Amino acid sequence: SDYIIAVLAGSRNNMEREYDYKSKIFFNELGDFEKIGRDCSKNAIKKLHSKKIKTCKSDVIFDSKVSASLLRNLFAACNSQTIIKGISFLKNKIEKKVFNSEISIVDNPLMQKKLRSRVSDCEGIESKKKFLIKNGILQFFFNSLSSARQLNNQPTGHASRSVSSIPSVSYSNLYMKNGKISKKQMIKSIKKGLLVTELMGSSINYSNGDYSRGASGFWIENGEISFPVSEITIAGNLLDIFSTLIPAPDLEFNYGINAPSCLVENLTLGGK
């Protein structure tokens, strides 16, 4: 079961939209739709009369609505097909530190009532809980039987296919474990920075990790939300992003890939 909601808020010279999306195994886990609608409407109104900011470097908080995109980037770089092509910036990082030592990222196909749970992959390889990142260290690359043979690795049980396609490499329930510092505390700690609530577009070079995405959200000044912002470009390098990333304790399982809100230091923000 799933839902998607989109709300438009407008004034005479300005219009903004807010959306929410959630997917669960059981309908009764989707939540209170009236509350979801009210919250979405309030968030759309908060976005009205957004401003542009000057180009600068600052700390950035990726809200939990968008932080899973960083795990999608991590998965793409850890996909054995990318490794075989030699175009991953993580190709030589197995058993090396990629995140700080407090971070662990798990792929667990055996979780109850989760979207991508399974007992085996599509090639019959037994599914097991595996740490992709354990205490900051990269543990494995996702593979299928074919890509495992090409890399001379053991199969990890991550083959997936539709009825009409050949097996390809995928994940099961991939998530980053909770951190200790709340999003509210993160906001309070920032003198000037950005809370990202929406990402759009993508320009990511997986050969070297260069990262650039369009974004909108809210500007933070002196530890408080100051005003809505839009038409921003966030730029950095994924190795630097991963190494400085700090997760909050607000993980929710709403999709196949899930992550809590994340604070990342010293990213370039392109504005006016």
Residue ranges and their predicted role:
Residues 1-272:
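N-terminal small-residue-enriched
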